[in-house]
């Protein structure tokens, strides 16, 4: 099953073209990655798929449903597409306890057994339940990113968008988070779309990848090509 299909995607900011004629598909259960230097357009594509960037041209479908420019994600679509951002501290409200941050999306959807769901999500990312009583500044960078991943898991998404999920973390923590993501993907049968400029991260996580430069996809790589290092930009 094709989870994401993009054809001729174009995104322009003022007079600058951020994404030009991009096209690719992502199959259920795989990790597909976009690799490229900062500013090449890969995160913009992620924001289109997440419904955060609503001004674009082209064809985009998610789970077989056509997505239109300006469309607001609601219902199952909003639940099934979740995003983990680059900086975990910036994506957590500094004045809210982690309990409020984690419980709020469940309350909005009228979910039941909220405390149990939050506890399970924290345990799945290796954090004790009493972490929920704390504030973001009381956690390490790696712990904050685990909380962000837990928040994404709470709604049980089918597609997880990962925007440089380890680039703001110390090297010693990066491998832990990447291994956690791989483990969770298998346990929850999710599909990942990963953005990174790090060739090692791409090789560790990906089934397939695409190299971007100046808003365009230049080349695709399968697993064999990545094992040979053909995806490296240097």
Residue ranges and their predicted role:
Residues 66-82, 96, 100, 108, ...:
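ABC ATPase NBD coupling module
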Residues 35-37:
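The feature captures the beta-strand-to-loop junction immediately N-terminal to the Walker
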Residues 135-139, 143:
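Conserved ABC ATPase signature
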Residues 4, 19-21:
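Conserved structural motif at the start of ABC-family nucleotide-binding domains
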Residues 50:
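Helix-to-loop junction immediately C-terminal to a conserved catalytic motif
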Residues 115-130:
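Conserved ABC ATPase "signature" region
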Residues 154-158:
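A short, proline-enriched helix->beta-strand linker immediately N-terminal to the Walker B motif
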């Amino acid at each position: 099953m094709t989870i994401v299909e993009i054809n001729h995607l174009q995104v322009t900011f003022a007079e600058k073209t951020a994404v030009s004629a991009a096209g690719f598909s992502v199959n259920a259960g795989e990790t597909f990655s976009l690799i490229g230097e900062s500013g090449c357009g890969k995160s913009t594509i992620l924001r289109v798929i997440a419904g955060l960037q609503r001004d674009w041209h082209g064809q985009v479908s998610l789970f077989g449903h056509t997505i239109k420019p300006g469309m607001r994600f609601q219902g199952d679509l909003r639940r099934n597409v979740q995003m983990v951002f680059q900086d975990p501290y910036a994506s957590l409200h500094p004045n809210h306890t982690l309990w409020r941050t984690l419980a709020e999306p469940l309350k909005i959807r009228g979910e039941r057994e909220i405390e149990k769901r939050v506890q399970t999500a924290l345990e799945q990312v290796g954090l004790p339940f009493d972490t929920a009583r704390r504030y973001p500044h009381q956690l390490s960078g790696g712990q904050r990113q685990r909380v962000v991943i837990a928040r994404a898991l709470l709604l049980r998404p089918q597609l997880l968008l990962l925007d440089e999920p380890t680039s703001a973390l110390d090297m010693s923590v990066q491998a832990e988070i990447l291994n956690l993501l791989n483990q969770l993907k298998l346990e929850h049968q999710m599909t990942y779309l990963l953005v990174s400029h790090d060739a090692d991260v791409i090789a560790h996580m990906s089934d397939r990848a695409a190299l971007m430069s100046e808003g365009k996809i230049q080349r695709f790589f399968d697993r064999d090509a990545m094992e040979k290092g053909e995806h490296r930009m240097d």
